Amino acid sequence: MTRNPFMVEPSNGSPNRRGASNLSKFYANANSNSRWANPSEESLEDSYDQSNVFQGLPASPSRAALRYSPDRRHRTQFYRDSAHNSPVAPNRYAANLQESPKRAGEAVIHLSEGSNLYPRDNADLPVDPYHLSPQQQPSNNLFGSGRLYSQSSKYTMSTTSTTAPSLAEADDEKEKYLTSTTSYDDQSTIFSADTFNETKFELNHPTRQQYVRRANSESKRRMVSDLPPPSKKKALLKLDNPIPKGLLDTLPRRNSPEFTEMRYTACTVEPDDFLREGYTLRFAEMNRECQIAICITMYNEDKYSLARTIHSIMKNVAHLCKREKSHVWGPNGWKKVSVILISDGRAKVNQGSLDYLAALGVYQEDMAKASVNGDPVKAHIFELTTQVSINADLDYVSKDIVPVQLVFCLKEENKKKINSHRWLFNAFCPVLQPTVVTLVDVGTRLNNTAIYRLWKVFDMDSNVAGAAGQIKTMKGKWGLKLFNPLVASQNFEYKISNILDKPLESVFGYISVLPGALSAYRYRALKNHEDGTGPLRSYFLGETQEGRDHDVFTANMYLAEDRILCWELVAKRDAKWVLKYVKEATGETDVPEDVSEFISQRRRWLNGAMFAAIYAQLHFYQIWKTKHSVVRKFFLHVEFLYQFIQMLFSWFSIANFVLTFYYLAGSMNLVIKHGEALFIFFKYLIFCDLASLFIISMGNRPQGAKHLFITSMVILSICATYSLICGFVFAFKSLASGTESHKIFVDIVISLLSTYGLYFFSSLMYLDPWHMFTSSIQYFLTLPAFTCTLQIFAFCNTHDVSWGTKGSTQESKQLSKAIVVQGPDGKQIVETDWPQEVDKKFLEIKSRLKEPEFEESSGNEKQSKNDYYRDIRTRIVMIWMLSNLILIMSIIQVFTPQDTDNGYLIFILWSVAALAAFRVVGSMAFLFMKYLRIIVSYRNKVEGSGSWEVSKLDLPNVFHKKG
């Protein structure tokens, strides 16, 4: 067992000097019925004759004894009160050796050195989360609760190498503990000078016992029996430091170190070796069941976005604790949820976000170390169970907030979001073993029941491997952001996707992408096969895509690695996993309000989606190796066919747009005066604009050519609006004239109106039609511009496989180092800087938290010069551009602008209407199945209660807007 140099050794625990002859004659709580004599009896009076003679002041207490004493007495006061014949002298024999109130017998249990750092936590006990558990209440003894928050410049700690106990050993210790109250034989009751005082001290003083255990866990080497041993042993540095006193005074619960002390772990290994090297998390050491692990990935988002997300998650955890009738949740539900925040790079993280975390108590900057024994730290892990929250207005909130187990992993290097997920799935999840893993992006605000709704899908259907939440756009106060056409068009796009696309794919069982802003996975489904293949292996292949070792196709495909993960789950060998859409779980996210950021974001989305769709189409045969039913496999093939058609339309989207403009605008040549002149002007204008877009996209970044992109998009919108007006004017004149030659254009207008009508009908059926009134006009006017601009820029930048679209912050602060050296007594000593003035820094952070942030303009990032990627990019653009150009020239040669019998245009427009109708059918099927489940659930509740008056249904309220 690792020893704390500040702790009094068992041989020094007695008030007598070391080496006293009567050391082994102290007995605990002896009574007249015990076979062990009481020291106060006359038969032993001679043995304690030394107590009648003054032999000097008692042994000096350790720093830990002073720190954990109930009244925190000074050393001189301790001497005075402990002197012989002092009127306030405590009975030190009884105080040091008194028995724990939770043990009824007088047996002594020898605690093994491999005991857990914390007592086992029984999450199933119906204990009020706002009150203390009887087992957690500190006993009123000499070393009671309370801690003196003093700091020192150096922290020295003794360590030894220990081996983690196996599960069998842990069960043996538990059995000994449970049977000790009735067993009094000599084998289970050990009385010796070497073990008696130590055993009784650790057992009978819970507060000091916890301190010893925490000290033992601070730096040790541990082997995991079921994993292969590491090639090189490394010292594991774990430091527990009190949270600031200003925060501690506001906490309703202070009965456990998880509330009062922040733990820091300096991880010097890669995430794949986290468990094998002996690293763990404090919540796992407490033996708690983990139902949900919520992962928040962060790059350089500001404190307002972080506060919005974390506060909404805390309200979700509080909702879980309110579900008292649930078979899983209830008052202690917070113990089954772990919130893991992973920041991608210490140099990239926003300082305001760090201040926010420090205000919660989970982050202390001075605790982080640069290296341990010369090994560079890969990740800084901070752990705390926080009981307060800070909302988006940066105000403290404690009402209706339950404790939340929070882990903050600050990666030393910036290795992209996929590496953050590697830390989650390969490092933390094997330790916590969660049932469901929920992924949330910083900036997403969840409704109060989102986490529960996502978890409930997995609980009700054992075949569900993943679930997608409903993503909404933040429209600002009173919806003022909708005046920005960019925000309004994205709002309409998100709504149509939530009403048509996601429900359709959910009915088939395969959702092409689970949004990273709000999605959930079953951890068991993510695990690889025994041969190493599986979803996670395919998912993390994208982290090492560099240079000629991997082709551009693979590199771009892994820009949408979440799409690959969705496919691998559904097509997992010898399984029958499906993906579902959860309409009730909503998350509001901020969308790009600037054109440059919007183009950069969609470039990654479009390239990743196209190459991932090609990957799924080429590997559709993997479905045959699954255990899906024949009916499921048939409908999955129907979905593959639908996606293939959608992919073809996407590939030829530029050509279809140009041809639609060409014939709609050309229809006015013979209708109005100077119609042909207008047609020629707009025709050459759109051709020149498209050619300019290719040049701009090939040689400029959106941040550097923002105005050029905006100008091109405005021109495309004007041309599209002109062609649409021409089509409607020509259709109305055709209706007025009643000529047979113009019926074909009437069909064109009807096909267009039917497409928009289907959108409106579906929105009404989902009781969410407001976007049709507030955002549809902006969407339809900007759709051609977005289609052309985004497609051209995406294809012209297939060589760019980078992720980041945001600037970085300033240089990171230099960290101190931790050195483990060999002491003269054979023990290992860890020397490192200890944080100074924790309380003062906390006050500074609180005052700085409310200050507004001013973002500094970041310089242009260094662009990749990989000739191989650029060569492949050129070939892809040439093939795509020439294929669209050949289609345009072929159709133009067949049909003239004045030709009313244009079969190709009719085919395109009715195809769009047919695809929209197919999506509507799938959406209505999803809605029908949803209401059918509600009816069946209601019927089951009625049959269970025997009455039609069911007081409270655990059903989603579909007629009210979710919060």
Curated annotation (Swiss-Prot):
Q: What is the lineage of its organism?
A: Eukaryota, Fungi, Dikarya, Ascomycota, Saccharomycotina
| UniProt membrane topology term | Multi-pass membrane protein
Which intervals lie on the Extracellular side per UniProt? 1-643, 699-711, 765-775, 897-905
Residues in compartment: Cytoplasmic: 665-677, 733-743, 797-875, 927-963
Q: What effect on the protein does mutating residue 602 to A have, as reported in its record?
A: Loss of activity
From the Swiss-Prot or TrEMBL record, give the protein name: Chitin synthase 2
Q: Which UniProt keywords apply?
A: Cell wall biogenesis/degradation, Glycoprotein, Glycosyltransferase, Membrane, Phosphoprotein, Transferase, Transmembrane, Transmembrane helix
User: Impact of changing residue 556 to A on the protein?
Assistant: 95% decrease of activity
